[in-house]
């Protein structure tokens, strides 16, 4: 059990005070810590249509051993902007202690879009990891579960069953 996430604000030399809380949850019960765009002197960065850019957050984190940090776009990113995290989910292993950076893509095919300093665009969720090894077998043991090989919405959609062409 981990008591708190250790982080360092690395925004020295900018107009943002070093004491600004750059990693926080909006509510104590939230799963993720909000991450803000850090741009020196409150500048903006233009991202053209279909373009992607890496932006810093001004934060370094110390992910505890046995855990991983997962970076997700905030839900408002998808509902209010054409931005998305280019890799969909970022992974921060416990050994990485550099600045947390985000690769942001403008999904608009027409408009330039701007990110501003302190825009909250991502969240960091820290979860335990499975630390076991991997064992190769020639066949999986039979499962007591009904699902079997069903996937991709195979439950609850009997009308559409067998109407999807799969490319394998």
Region locations from a protein language model:
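DUTPase catalytic domain/fold
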Residues: 1-168
């Amino acid at each position: 059990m981990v008591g708190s996430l250790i982080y360092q604000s690395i925004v020295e030399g900018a107009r943002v005070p070093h004491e600004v809380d750059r990693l926080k949850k909006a509510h104590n019960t939230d799963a993720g810590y909000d991450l803000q765009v850090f741009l020196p002197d409150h500048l903006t960065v233009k991202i053209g249509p279909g373009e992607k850019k890496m932006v810093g957050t001004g934060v370094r984190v110390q992910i505890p051993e046995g855990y991983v940090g997962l970076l997700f776009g905030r839900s408002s990113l998808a509902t209010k902007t054409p931005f998305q995290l280019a890799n969909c989910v970022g992974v921060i292993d416990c050994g990485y202690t550099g600045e947390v950076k985000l690769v942001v893509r403008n999904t608009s095919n027409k408009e330039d879009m701007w990110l501003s300093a302190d825009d909250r665009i991502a969240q960091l969720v820290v979860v335990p990891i499975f630390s076991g090894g991997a064992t190769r077998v020639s066949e999986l043991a039979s499962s007591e579960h009904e699902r079997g090989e069903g996937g991709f919405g195979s439950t609850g959609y009997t009308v559409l069953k067998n109407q999807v062409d799969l490319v394998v």
